[in-house]
Each structure stands twice: as C-alpha cells, then as structure tokens.
Amino acid sequence: SSTQNLSTSPILRRQNRIRTIYSSLAIEQNTLSLEQVTAVLSGKRVLAPPKDIAEVKNAYEIYDHLAELNPYSMDDLLLAHRTMMQGLVREAGEFRSGPVGVVDNKGNVLHFGTLPQYVPSLMEELIQWTESSSLPILIKSCVFHYEFEVIHPFSDGNGRIGRLWHTLLLSKWNPVFAWLPVESIIQDHQAEYYAAINQSNAQGEGTVFIEFMLGIIKEALTEAINEQPVAQSKEEVRWMKIAAFLRTNYIIQNVDVQNLLNVSPATASRVLHTLTKEGKLAKVRNGRYWAYKLA
C-alpha cells in the first residue's frame, strides 16, 4: 500500500520529515523557507537569523529521536522540550514558573494558561489519563493535544511540543504516523486550527478541536496514499535483493544471483562486477570459485 511506501522509502520519509519541521516552525513565525530548512539540515550555510536556524536544528534532533521517546513519560516530555528549546529560552526542559497567555499566529490572546503552581500535577494527570483511557488512540491523541494547549505547561514552545506529542502518540500505535506530514496540513489550515481551539475553549470542552484534528489526520493520510512512491530503477531493485540475501548469507555466488534475479549467468556476472566496482560488494575466493560479500 502507499502508506507502506512511506514507511520504507527513505527519500519520502526525509521529504516529509523536513516538511513537518518547516511547517511546525512556520506556524510559530520561523522565517526560513522550505528550501532554507532543507539546506540547514543538509549542513549548508544559510543567511538567516541564528534563532531561526537553531530552531530548525533543535526540532530535527528531537524528531530524529522520536522512536526512542515514551509518550507516557513526564521525563521524556521535559527532555523533548529541553532539546526543542535549548539555547532559545531560559526554562528549556522545565515547566514555566510564571503566568502565560495563549496567543494565535497573529498575536491575539486566546486564553490564559493554567496557573503555574498547578501545571505539574495537571500534566501528570493528563499523561496518566492518556495512558489508561480506553478511548481509541486517534481520539485520545487529539484530547491530549487540546488539553496540553489549554494547560500551556511551558513558557514557550507549547505549540510545537503539543504537535510533536500528538505525532508521537499516533506513531506508537502505527509507525507510519512518525512520517506523516500532519503539521504541514495544520499549517495549511492555520486559521481553522486556532479557531477550533477558541471554539472549544468557549464551549469548555474539546469536541470541536478533536473533530478538526481528526479531519487533519484524514487529510494527511489521504495525501500519503495519493503520493506516488519514488520510482526505483532496475539496478536499485536488484541491489536491494542482493543486499537482503547477504543479510542472512555470508557470501553470494553467480548461481545465487541467477536464481534470485531470474537472469542469465552473463547478466549475473555483469551485475556482480558493477556492484563490486561501485564498492558495494567485495570479491572473495570460495574454494574453486569466486564469490562476493558485502564490502
């Protein structure tokens, strides 16, 4: 299926990861373009405010370690904030010590976050509820995202951590969600994102926001399904089959390649010669015959 292509294609995954980081930061007024974000993450020099560059590097670091995070660990949540906000805010990796107003992307105050003295216990409660509730994870993750934004536990970085944690919760249910560009779809519907938070606040419960986020997730899935996988050349497919064979066998011989790829002895010989020249295989003596192993 196309979502499997997303899980297995490193090119698609990298593209979506970069889009995710670009979008999550653009929502927070980061000025870098998608091309500049790509350049920063490729180690190139980019002329831009140092703060914006640091935000990109920090975000990439935490998204890169997504698989290692436990969504039900307070320590991991604080670690994620510390990584995301290191060098950017004084209280990186700590719950805020002062009051905070929750603002939209235009600077309008939507509501005021929970009083700081109640933040740790409310966050503990929210994490425990998310872990123990029997609601489907699709719903629970949206509830967590909404309640997290209401509490607004940090002095800064709440939006990007809330979206990161939503992705993390979903990715533990199905790994494909680690690579879905949910943040990009939110960026496309930014005004509605804040309106949904606003409406839910006015109603005193998160139904509007939950329905909005379910729509966003559906749109991200639809986009992934419609996304054409990057076509692989015949050579790449052959190399993948040989590499897979060599993960369970120490060496491969001409006859193995014939059977594996359904080719003639001459073609098998040519394939092995090319892969050796490319530095992927190394030629070794195997009794009276030549064989090949991973270089």
Where are these regions (language model features)?
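FIC/Doc superfamily catalytic core
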Residues: 1-295
